[in-house]
């Protein structure tokens, strides 16, 4: 009987300790994030606040979702071309005028046409090793775990931000990605009168944080992507 009572007491003590630890972690999760060293700002205030400064340099990150991921990428490319070269491995999804509308300096954008998975992997490997660009964008493709791991190692070693554009990241990519963001269309923004006489002004995105090395997932930000015509008329 004494042994049974002692065992129950130990279980109760462990349960109390667990509840106390859970409460402490929950309290820490509600605190504002501190700025993280070695980040690359996106020039989108709402997104930079979500990421405590921006994308982590020297890492693999994903921009996911059916809508809006290229709007986020365009803002980042615009900010980066002010001080560095940017490489984009293009499988046909890129629309260069959209980059220009976002303010990117196209003379500092290296566009590499790619079609096959092997071409994408080789191009990413070569540019990462060359260290000529601080930012590389590439399409999501099916690669072996070892290849994703090698690309992640090269990005980390050379201080390059490698962003993978994906509708949804697969298991191998998710494993090596230090940051994962998912973009979703929240609403269309109209200019002027609604209906026949209204005009498209842009859209509002909801950006969800799915993975981050230093920040708990689940946080989100709302970002407005305005068309160039709307910006000119405002």
Annotate each language-model stretch with its function.
Residues 164-234:
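Phosphate-binding/switch region of NTP-binding enzymes
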Residues 83, 105-107, 132-133, 158-161, ...:
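Short glycine-/polar-rich loops that comprise or flank the Walker A/P-loop
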Residues 83-146:
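Conserved inter-motif catalytic segment of the P-loop NTP-binding fold
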Residues 16, 42, 68-75, 94, ...:
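Charged, alpha-helix-enriched surfaces in structured cytosolic catalytic cores
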Residues 47, 63, 109, 136, ...:
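Conserved RecA-like P-loop NTPase ATPase core
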Residues 132-172:
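A contiguous pocket-lining binding segment that forms or flanks enzyme active sites
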Residues 1-88, 101, 210-215, 227-234:
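Detector for small/aliphatic-rich hydrophobic stretches
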Residues 53-55, 79-80, 103-104, 126-130, ...:
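Conserved catalytic network of the ASCE P-loop NTPase/AAA+ motor domain
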